[in-house]
From Swiss-Prot:
This is Undecaprenyl-diphosphatase. It catalyses: di-trans,octa-cis-undecaprenyl diphosphate + H2O = di-trans,octa-cis-undecaprenyl phosphate + phosphate + H(+). GO terms for biological process: cell wall organization; peptidoglycan biosynthetic process; regulation of cell shape; response to antibiotic. The chain crosses the membrane at residues 2-22, 42-62, 80-100, 108-128, 149-168, 175-195, 214-234, 248-268. InterPro entries: UppP (IPR003824). Catalyzes the dephosphorylation of undecaprenyl diphosphate (UPP). Confers resistance to bacitracin. It is found in: Cell membrane. It holds the Pfam family BacA. Its EC number is 3.6.1.27.
């Protein structure tokens, strides 16, 4: 039952943090360290709950995704442009992700690097939002230009550092490229589908598939939990972006990251 409890905790953490700019991977690393959830099974579990979160994107945006497929052959080819933008934006992360995956897993998946990523990412969010949020020109995702998707894709590579946040990186890239807050967030959500499915597939292959019955049950609990929490968070986050700045997330990141670094520097705790 302890494993099930850990699964529920981590599923909630994943669902709450995957699509907001605070780094779900960073939070999973920190919480896993606190509840002593480590090893090969833990790595597999984290992959599976991320897939649950991705399924939530598909469900929330099912109509828009379906219409974008139908619109591939529309006279204005807007559906085709949409999918070309998604594919192009994925390329940088695919290249760097596959090339650096082992290095990242070995050297960057620890609380200290997460804390550094949280602080740096938070500072960047404040700077970028203050300068670029109100300069947006593209207010419809179908109007995105190829250069904008390339720029967002390059920024997504920042998220290879745990703690930086894929959501924060892509939204910041979108703002600088001229996307409105909502378009930047939605493009970030859509971009998460192929990128995270690919990354999760790679880790699944490396992890293997053997597990006990209770471990399998915990996987199901985690998957469903992350899916349900993500459903709520996605819709709430879009409504939040329409009215309020993301500064609160940046402040939260800087606060948590700074506390962790102070604790480590003064050796109050070992992280």
């Amino acid at each position: 039952m302890l494993l099930i409890l850990k699964a529920i905790i981590l599923a909630i953490v994943e669902g709450l943090t995957e699509f907001v700019p605070v780094s779900s991977t960073g939070h999973l690393i920190l919480v896993s360290d606190v509840i002593n959830f480590k090893g090969d099974y833990a790595n597999l579990f984290n992959v599976v709950i991320q897939l649950g979160a991705i399924l939530a994107v598909v469900v929330v945006y099912w109509d828009k995704l379906l219409n974008s497929v139908k619109d591939i052959f529309a006279p204005d080819r807007r559906g085709l442009r949409f999918w070309i933008n998604i594919v192009v934006a994925c390329i940088p992360a695919v290249i760097f992700g596959f090339s650096l995956d082992d290095y990242i897993d070995k050297y960057l998946f620890n609380p200290i690097t997460v804390a550094i990523g949280l602080v740096i990412g938070g500072i960047l969010m404040i700077i970028v939002e203050n300068k670029y949020r109100r300069r947006s020109k593209t207010k419809n995702i179908y109007d995105m230009k190829l250069r904008q998707s390339i720029f967002v894709g390059m920024f997504q590579c920042l998220a290879l550092w745990p703690g930086m946040s894929r959501s924060a990186s892509t939204i910041m890239g979108g703002w600088i490229a001229g996307l409105s807050p909502v378009v930047a967030a939605e493009f970030s959500f859509f971009l998460a589908i192929p990128v995270m499915v690919g990354a999760s597939g790679l880790k699944l292959v490396k992890s293997g598939f053997y597990m006990t019955n209770i471990e399998f049950i915990a996987l199901i609990v985690g998957f469903v939990g992350a899916f349900l929490v993500s459903l709520v968070v996605i819709e709430k986050f879009i409504k939040f972006l329409q009215k309020k700045p993301m500064r609160i997330f940046a402040i939260y990141r800087i606060f948590i990251g700074a506390i962790l670094l102070i604790l480590a520097i003064f050796k109050i705790v070992t992280i």
